[in-house]
Amino acid sequence: MEKEIFYDSDGAKIRAFLATPENPKLAVIVIHEIWGLNDNIKDISRRLANEGYMALAPQLYTRNEDVLNEGNIQNVMMKVWSIPPEKRNDPNSYQQIMSALDEKGKKVAELLVLNRQKTEEQMIKDAIKAYEYVSSQGVKKIVSMGFCMGGGLAFQLATEVPLDGTIVFYGRNPQPLEAIQKIKGPILGLYAGEDPPIDAGLPDLISAIIKYKKDLELKIYPGAYHAFFNDRGRSYNKEAAEDAWERVKSFLRRVSK
């Protein structure tokens, strides 16, 4: 079964895609990439349902869906990513981009670039309410799973609620890193070998995992790039994606026992 549902969160009705078999073994909260709740995330949710799991994929852009659609986001982020890494801390670089954007583009940039932390704080609140919604459905165990931006949000969510497991696809570390001590269940981390901005955080992550004695399965795919699991994207890596999916299935079987 699959359907669109809405759940309450801080005065808003958050839209979400639900895919589930009868009598699911556990539930997975699927957190989208920077592109929002799109066909790729829905397909991943269906794949999880086919494995016997409930999958709930919230549209964490519901509050700003009038401007945060995939086309607008691509238009802005391609400009942002065109800035050389060494100039991304220079306010003048962003000012040049902002001056070339229309009003919707400027709103996207404000939400996802200039005020990203504030936006993600609200998304975490809405993800917590997704956890509460899933909990109300009678499922005994709940896992978070996220990609890119959503990987970081899935990781952060694990520091906020007692998840039974966390699956991070090339997402940033929780903030602050010490929050890892709050994580309850095991973690599966799947990373691209050619992803310097994310991979730079892995040594600190591993140190924190050791310090707080957490359960982490870490896999780095040499030669793969950020977003290697997205079969609609230019960075799709079939070999890495297939191996990662097998690891996801194995991890979920372990957690569901």
UniProtKB/Swiss-Prot annotation:
GO terms for molecular function: carboxymethylenebutenolidase activity. This is Putative carboxymethylenebutenolidase. InterPro entries: AB_hydrolase_fold, Dienelactn_hydro, Dienelactone_hydrolase-like. SUPFAM superfamilies: alpha/beta-Hydrolases. It comes from Saccharolobus solfataricus (strain ATCC 35092 / DSM 1617 / JCM 11322 / P2) (Sulfolobus solfataricus). Its EC number is 3.1.1.45. It catalyses: 2-(5-oxo-2,5-dihydrofuran-2-ylidene)acetate + H2O = 4-oxohex-2-enedioate + H(+). Transmembrane segments: none annotated. Belongs to the dienelactone hydrolase family. The active site is at 148, 195, 226. Keywords: Hydrolase.
